[in-house]
């Protein structure tokens, strides 16, 4: 399913904004939004899967804090593509589905108390086996192009490139995808020749991108294991807890923010919860903590006078509608096939995961 962009009335009136456009990634039949995974990761999952060569015999590996796992599981199950998900044990409640998945989808987890980075580390151990391959993350053009559909949806609906782009980020790949889509639209020539200002937001206290940007640094500050796991446990938006985002390398988030005169901001759990409540009251549907962080950041900037009330603003609601799609339904949860300690030996991991797909 595709993102749906519409001009806000309720939220826009509340904030005093003349041109607020919401790009909705999720489930809301009232606006014909049909992403049953309730996440914008659904757009990237199908584009990544569509790019896998025919005859590929290896198993796709995806590390996730939750929403990517749900989206890839849905896509790979429907396409019968062998998939191994690596997720922190404390995030498995995100792996709900409206129907059982194909047995080609398997889940392994890192022990309780671990975070997204630990899931990535586990995936790296799996990839020592020649029977598995990595989906590629931010470096996979299919992933960026999939997420870039949100920006394309907004621009083609509005009829012009927006002035501002708001999104909460963990890796920042979605914002990079928006920047790349923006550049292509400039080349197209029908929607303007300017770059939307990227305003990315993080959920405090887990905010390595914010800290690096505010320090004027291209490098993400060191985040030791203890404090990273502690902060990841504190924040509501678990999907934003990436310790090592693709920020520094050429063409990454730092370059995207620089090129667009962008900014990085933060929102607390309390601010995000208020924003989520406001969105449901004014726009009529629930949103996840991550887009609530983005909305909270927009509210802060509007209230501080940092944004012209006449500006054309795109708010990327990256996940929404779980309450609607799960109401009065018996859900099916993907259960872990194996729990690994943080110190699991590479050979043990490889042996275990190979057995999962040979049984």
Segments and roles (model prediction):
Residues 1-359:
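PLP-dependent amino-acid enzyme catalytic core
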């Amino acid at each position: 399913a595709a993102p749906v962009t519409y001009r806000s009335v309720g939220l826009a009136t509340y904030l005093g904004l003349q041109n607020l456009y919401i790009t909705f990634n999720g489930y809301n039949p009232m606006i014909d939004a049909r992403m049953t995974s309730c996440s914008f990761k659904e757009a990237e999952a199908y584009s990544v899967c569509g790019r896998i060569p025919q005859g590929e015999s290896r198993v796709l590996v995806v590390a996730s804090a939750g929403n990517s796992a749900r989206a890839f599981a849905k896509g790979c199950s429907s396409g019968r593509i062998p998939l191994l998900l690596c997720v922190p044990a404390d995030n498995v409640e995100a792996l709900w589905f409206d129907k059982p998945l194909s047995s080609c989808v398997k889940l392994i987890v890192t022990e309780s108390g671990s975070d997204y980075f630990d899931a990535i580390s586990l995936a790296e151990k799996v990839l020592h086996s020649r029977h598995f391959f990595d989906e590629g993350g931010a470096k996979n053009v299919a992933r960026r192009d999939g997420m870039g559909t949100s920006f394309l949806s907004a621009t083609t609906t509005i009829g012009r490139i927006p002035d501002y782009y708001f999104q909460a980020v963990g890796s920042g790949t979605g914002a990079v995808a928006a920047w790349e889509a923006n550049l292509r639209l400039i080349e197209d020539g029908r929607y303007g020749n300017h770059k939307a200002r990227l305003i990315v937001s993080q959920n405090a206290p887990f905010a390595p991108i914010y800290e690096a940007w505010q320090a004027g640094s291209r490098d993400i500050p060191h985040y030791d294991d203890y404090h990273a796991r502690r902060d990841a446990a504190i924040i509501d938006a678990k999907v934003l807890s990436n310790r090592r985002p693709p920020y520094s390398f050429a063409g990454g988030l730092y370059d995207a923010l620089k090129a667009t005169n962008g900014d990085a901001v933060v929102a607390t759990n309390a601010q995000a919860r208020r924003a989520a409540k406001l969105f449901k009251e004014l726009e009529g549907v629930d949103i996840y903590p991550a887009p609530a962080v983005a909305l909270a950041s927009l509210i802060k900037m509007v209230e501080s006078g940092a944004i012209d009330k006449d500006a054309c603003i795109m708010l990327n609601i990256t996940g929404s509608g779980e309450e609607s799609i799960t109401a009065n339904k018996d859900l099916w949860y993907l259960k872990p096939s194996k729990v690994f300690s943080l110190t699991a030996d590479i050979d043990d991991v490889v042996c275990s995961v190979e057995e999962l797909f040979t049984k």
